[in-house]
């Protein structure tokens, strides 16, 4: 399994998108692909989090948590700024409590990796229901907070 790489330019930035599987067996591919795609010179990274109950916890598991490992890899590449995209909020009924729990637990870990709170952005979203993905959320359960 390889990592998908795509490039595009905005008015201000040259963007390199690396999409890699989250499974631990593919971590060497992440490292190899990131160095080949100049990700080690990135200004910002997006860390995609699964908000569903059990999935987030598995990613934070001390012995095999891929969320933790990916955050550490991002930081080891010298990336200071990170966007944490908390996806699948629809599965947890757009629970602000769930989002806040994820933000608190992961935020603590990100700080321990050297990320500064001022350079971490948190975005709750639901890709399946197109909520807060491209435009502001329309679902009242989500937009109310």
Which functions belong to the PLM regions below?
Residues 30:
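Active-site-proximal loop/helix segments of hydrolase catalytic cores
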Residues 1-12:
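Switch I (effector-binding) loop of TRAFAC-class P-loop GTPase G-domains
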Residues 33, 73, 108-112:
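A generic secondary-structure signal
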Residues 1-2, 21, 89, 128:
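Alpha-helical hydrophobic packing sites
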Residues 12-16, 20-27, 36-100:
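Conserved Switch II/interswitch segment of TRAFAC-class P-loop GTPases
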Residues 80-83, 91-145:
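Canonical P-loop GTPase G-domain recognition
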Residues 4, 27, 108:
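Eukaryotic intrinsically disordered and solvent-exposed regulatory patches
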């Amino acid at each position: 399994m390889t990592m998908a790489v795509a490039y595009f330019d905005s008015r201000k930035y040259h963007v390199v998108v690396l999409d890699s599987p989250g499974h631990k067996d593919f971590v060497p591919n992440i490292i190899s692909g990131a160095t080949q795609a100049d990700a080690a010179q990135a200004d910002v990274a997006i860390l995609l989090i699964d908000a569903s109950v059990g999935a987030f916890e598995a990613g934070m598991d001390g012995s095999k948590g891929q969320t933790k490992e990916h955050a550490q890899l991002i930081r080891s590449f010298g990336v200071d700024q990170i966007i944490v995209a908390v996806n699948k909020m629809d599965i947890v009924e757009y629970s602000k409590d769930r989002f806040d729990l994820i933000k608190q637990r992961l935020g603590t870990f990100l700080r321990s990796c050297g990320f500064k709170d001022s350079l971490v952005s948190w975005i709750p979203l639901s890709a399946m229901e197109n909520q807060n993905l491209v435009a502001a959320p329309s679902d009242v359960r989500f937009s109310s907070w």
